[in-house]
Amino acid sequence: MSAQSVRISGKVLSSDRGSLEGLTVIIQPGNLTAITDNKGQFYFTNIPKDAKTLKIKHAGYLPYEIKLLLKQNAILLPDILLKTDIKQLKEVVITDHFGFRRNKTESLNIETVNSNFIQRNLGGSLMQSLQRIPGVKTISVGSGGSKPLIRGLSFNQVIVVENGIKHEGQQWGADHGLEIDQYAVNRVEIIKGPSSFMYGSDAIGGAVTIKPVPLPFKNTLGGSIDFTGKSNNEQFGGSINLFGRNEKWFFDTRMTVMDYGDYRVPTDTVHVYNYAVPLYKNQLRNTAGRELDLHASTGYVTQKFTSVFYASNVYTKSGFFANAHGLEPRNVDTELHDKSSRDILMPFQEVTHTKISNTTSFQLGNHKVETQLGYQKNFRREWSHYVNHGFMPPIYPDDMYAPQDLERQYDKQVFSVAFKDEFSWRKNQFTVGINAEQQQNNINGWSFLIPAFKQFNAGLFVYDKLRLSELWLLHGAVRLDYGKIEMKQYNDWFPSEITENGQTTSQFLKRSNDLTRTFESFNWSAGVNYTPGKISLKANMGTSFRMPIAKELASNGVNYHYFRFEKGDPNLSAERSYQLDLGMEWQENKWSFQLSPFFNYFPNYIYLNPTSRHDIYYGAGNQVFEYEQGKVMRYGGELQTRYQFLENFSAEILAEYLYSEQLSGSKKGYTLPFSPPASVLFGINYSPQIKNLSDTYFSLDYRYTAAQNQIVPPERKTSSSNIFNLALGTKLKTGQQDFIISLQVQNLLNTRYLNHTSFYRLIELPEASRNIILSVKLPFLISK
């Protein structure tokens, strides 16, 4: 250490002495910064002896500042206790700089957004609200449902974690949306790239992590009310939140209600497999829906011990586009459907997702221990009029085990347990964890696609973060996983005529066999961060894996949404991935720049391959698609840059690119299904200072999406598009409370365009027409 420099270290705590992670500590002059770790600790090296002030400023807490007297070469400051700013209520605002600071200490590419971002970009579902983030897209199912698509991967290749528990729905289906209430979300972290060493199988493409809502401040009682209205599908609804806390006990509750009608598209005719379907008032008939979500949490909090119980129930009922479901798309009673745009007729789906979990953490000396217990039940039913096809009887049997209109039913129950220990040793910060999950999946209904099955997964991991110096940070992780899946035999409930050797007999065809498969995998990850001043560089490489799911191993039925027969392969091996992620970030007072390239190789990628065969037993001679494995290469990246022209005027550019290619198999040279095309977004933002208002903004986005000509049959090429979106909002002060208003105009020019990753892309269905979204939030404080 130079005779003219000093080393300073310390710890930042809340008023109840809880550790505060991710805060920026600033020393001036020189504007030197450090980030607090998960214990609230920070340190500086090589501080000039003329440094005078240490400052900490973070949303939700009062600013902190002390004068420095640097008379020694090494100074350990007393614990710094930040006082809460009661005017912030419970909802701590995470600024745009949080993600930048977080990325300086992580070798993976992580995007962080908060509830303000979601309200400002509010869509019909959580993932639709997040797709402004480069590298993040959705597979949308109508206006109220979607699933995440991260760098072109989705379904069981991307996981969603809510309050520390892996969300387990029926994510294998393209028409199955994510059962998450976006109004209950406070902060989301999106990991772009493999995350298997943290979460195990299914995180081979990335993770969407929904962080727990911050605990209420001591001795408060308050809440908020949200109102939302949308013009396109005439949606109305809202969410009400009530929370409270004394010294150690707290509660937090929420109820969300939504009701919406058929959504509109900028065309009066769509073509369902060459059949022209007229649309009444441009409405997509039978795409209305309803949603009712209930949430509650309660817990006990002390300085060294916290235990929180979470419970939620998310219910949705939504219709399928009536002209694009089943084997008879022409036989639709359009007059009945067009009588009302708000009724939900057949075909429709009902989904109820229930979660109960507990997260307990406590401090044991140098160890921070966390345990998690969880239970989930996902109950999904798809209703459709019974239509016989193949050898199915023309009249539905009275003694059938399933109701006549119950096409399919999936009943999943999941029990999970996890244990994690975080501790420091010298310059190392270790995390050791173990998790296990047991699934029971049952089926019902007159139509078959996948069998009932049981599944068990368990994993053990060790992660080390080694700080070599203020500039260098190393990461290393290893993980061992074990998985087992047991599928049950299934026979048709009706006999089919089988002709062999000139003789015809009636048989109850076996659709799936009893099958048990086990999988084991060892994976590793290594990374580095280098932060020389305002520039931050990172690199991460490692392996990931994914167990094949029941649909890939044992599906054997008609997918009515795609008019195809899907057949699994019981001999598939576990999917494996090798990935290299790089990152460069630079931030000045007015400029910020971020580049995140990646390279990905799969030696045995699992995909659904069309064959030349056609089904002869189950209807209209649908083409047979079989699951296969092959070598796949993927590369691409994301670019983000922002510039503050004036105090109130800024601009940004967000770009993304992905290239995928199959290197072996019958589709060698082709890309992968649902590969999003390149796109770039140009945004401008004006934030004027207006009396009695705060956080006022006017923004205009222009997104250019390139044509997608690299496809996998039966996909179709998608033309380029040019879309404008407008947004504005403000906070109106009413006493000590804020009245928050947000207004969006999506698809400002009512442009007709196709989304290559949409569920309805195959039938040339354009995206929604102009949509005006009004959102109003009223936080309130009853007592303090």
Language-model region placement:
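Short, acidic, small-residue-rich periplasmic hinge/interaction motif at the N-terminus
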Residues: 13-15, 23-28, 57-61, 71-119, ...
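Short acidic/polar hinge/loop motifs at secondary-structure boundaries
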Residues: 43-45, 165-192
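C-terminal beta-signal and adjacent terminal beta-strands/loops
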Residues: 260, 266, 601-604, 608, ...
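N-terminal periplasmic accessory domains that precede
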Residues: 76-81, 126-129, 144-149, 161, ...
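Gram-negative outer-membrane beta-barrel transporters
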Residues: 470, 598-602, 618-708
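Outer membrane beta-barrel strand-and-loop segments of large Gram-negative receptors
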Residues: 399-420, 567-574, 579-580, 585-588, ...
